[in-house]
Structure formats: structure tokens, C-alpha cells
Regions:
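Cytochrome P450 catalytic-domain "roof"
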Residues: 152
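Short, hydrophobic beta-strand segments that form beta-sheet elements in well-ordered domains
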Residues: 33-35, 105-109, 126-131
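Extended, subdomain-level signal for the structured scaffold at the beginning of enzyme domains
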Residues: 1-101, 113-118, 124, 137-147, ...
Length: 192
């Protein structure tokens, strides 16, 4: 799948989703937000509504089977958002194909365990972090848990939760662009 896309389902964690979208755009990434529904309106876990760039039908029209390590599929956490993503079969099939084609994947909070670990041994042997309480789900799928704010393992980036959303997004930006771009965006958040 060519490009960078962040996927939204009702119940998404607002801080994780919006911080990631914003930081990637500040870094010059042409990231598109995608609703898994047939309309672009999604509602977060705390009632915030968002209109995505694309709905699922619009994404289907532009999907490519090619992928490179700088093409990312991104999954915010939140419940029941992560569960809703994991239960949407066409998205899970696309994720599996994207990973197999060499594309990058990023997930934060509950999504490493609920979305990624749901694909069986697809991510077995890799190192991830997740929201507290989901560690056993990772380990049951053969995934190595690491307690950290953000973990990068090759073309896989995971984040622990909303308190680490900025670190997570900057890690993705460093993978897609480079560390200098991520550092420049990060520097813009700190007063001199």
C-alpha cells in the first residue's frame, strides 16, 4: 500500500490519533486519515468527532499492492476503537498484505495487542510496547513485550499510550523521513 494512512474507527483514542496526524503533517508527510466506515465521520472514545480525509470506499479506489518501508499503516488505540479496527476484516487483510509486501506498521495503546496480535504469528518474534494490562496478549502471540514509551523494531513502531503519543509520532516520522526531521519538529514544541 503506497503512502501513509492512519485508520479510524468509533472509539479511537483522540490524543493518540490527532497528535500522530499533526506531527506527521508538520514533518511533511502526506498522511491521510481513513474511516473504516462508508462515511467520514468518526467519534472518539471521549466524544470528540472527526471527519477523516477518506472513508473505506474511497481508500479502496486508491489501494496499491506495492509497499516500501516508508509506507505506513497507523493504528491509534482506545477502546472500543482498537476492537472495531481488529474486527473489520478488509482492514486486517490489507494490513497482512501490506506487512508481507514490506510496508511499515505503527500501533499505539491497545492496538499492538488488539489489532496486531490478532493476526496470529504475523508479528511473532518482534518487540513491541502497549498499554498497561495488554502485555499478556502480546506474549501469547509470540511478541516480545518491552516496557517503554515507544519501541521501534525494524519497520514496526509501537507506543504505550496517550502519554507517549508525541514520542510515538516522532518515532514514526523518523522512520518515514529521518531523525533530523523528527528532531526539528520536536524542537518546535519547546520554547527557547
Amino acid at each position: 500500500m503506497k503512502g501513509t494512512f492512519i485508520f479510524f474507527a468509533d472509539g479511537f483514542e483522540e490524543v493518540e490519533a490527532i497528535a500522530t496526524l499533526d506531527i506527521l503533517r508538520r514533518g511533511g508527510v502526506d498522511v491521510k486519515s481513513v474511516s473504516i466506515y462508508d462515511n467520514s465521520l468518526v467519534e472518539g472514545a471521549h466524544g470528540q468527532q472527526l471527519i477523516t480525509d477518506l472513508c473505506w470506499e474511497g481508500l479502496e479506489e486508491i489501494i496499491s499492492t506495492e509497499a516500501s518501508p516508508s509506507d505506513y499503516m497507523i493504528f491509534p488505540g482506545g477502546m472500543p476503537g482498537a476492537k472495531n479496527l481488529a474486527e473489520f476484516g478488509p482492514l486486517m487483510a490489507l494490513l497482512k498484505a501490506h506487512w508481507a509486501a514490506g510496508g511499515g506498521v505503527a500501533a499505539i495503546c491497545a492496538s499492538p495487542a488488539v489489532v496486531l496480535a490478532s493476526l496470529g504469528d504475523t508479528f511473532a518474534g518482534l518487540e513491541m510496547t502497549c498499554y498497561d494490562g495488554f502485555e499478556a496478549t502480546l506474549q501469547a502471540a509470540g511478541i516480545k513485550h518491552k516496557e517503554a514509551g515507544s519501541v521501534v523494531d525494524g519497520r514496526l513502531v509501537t507506543g504505550r499510550g496517550p502519554g507517549y503519543a508525541t514520542e510515538f509520532a516522532l518515532s514514526i516520522l523518523a522512520q518515514i523521513k529521518d531523525r533530523d526531521t523528527a528532531a526539528a519538529v520536536s524542537a518546535g514544541f519547546t520554547p527557547r
